[in-house]
Amino acid sequence: MAQTVRRASKANRPNADDVRTALSEGYCTHQDARHVFETALDAPGVRDVVRTRLAQTARALIVDEIFDANALDLALVRLAADAGLEVTVVGDPWQALYAFRGARPEEVPALTHEARFVQRDLHTSFRWTSPRQALLAAELRAGLGQILPKGPAETTDVLIALQWKSLWEAGAHVLPLAYKSTTGNIQEAACTLVLSEVTQRMFSEAATFHADALITLGITHDAAQRLRPLLQSIVDDLESTTDTAKVWSALNAAVATETDRPLPKRPHATHIARLKNLSTRLRNSSRLVPGLTAHQAKGREWDVVGVRLTDAECAVLRQGLRADSEDHRKLYVALTRARTRTVLVPANEL
């Protein structure tokens, strides 16, 4: 059985020799293991062995979020059903958001039909605590067009948008929990660690891609704890000074104490802007509102949710949503995170 490990802490992009050495010692990534297994299932003999093994070792299988399943996930569900296990799959086609990860929600109906699943629809949600929020969700699912009531961001518990960029443009009283969807860039990862210190200070919650930033920088858990006092000092500097170039240099020096990644010698305008955005929010006297995208908000709930939508997204909402469009499903998820009320936060209210 191959062992699965995280990317080596000293290699942001491991070379071929390192990969071959790791594989020869029985180490691989989770994705490597999935790829090998998926390929092996194409061989009839292997499928038979897996089916028999499932029948011998398991009685039942419960799969949540089935509409986020990729090809391998669906293949295993099929095998479990063929092996005679009691298989239950749970999911909402309106909340399938992970096509970029290989999810295949369009294949789920065929799976449940071919495997003769009995469908039981759930019509009650314990999230809604107000009739209007329950009505909004029902009408969205029915494809009815919507014009949301407007409200200021300050009265909401969270602001949700479909893109991180929209959240950073939402004003100094909104603090998004990420800069963008990836932290593969070294300096982007360093800025994410500073952002994470701010979000922990303000919301008791780490930045969305905090763990990814540590991996990009090759920083272990223990090293991250040693680094925190330096990062907290940098946050204090951002709050008290407008010299972000000086803060950038201090950030580079701090991160260099715990990583051997090659840090840039000159500041890039994008990363200076990142620090300036944080500085502006730290000096803001009003309550900060956390900002999340629909992807990060999925599965969570708040009492009052504000949404920031583009003109094009508002136009789509007025026409009505369709479950077969991922962009429409993102809007549905954003608009159904509130227990009591969802409001549109227009640009002139930010």
What residues fall within each predicted segment?
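The feature marks helicase ATPase cores and/or their adjacent C-terminal helical subdomains
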Residues: 1-350
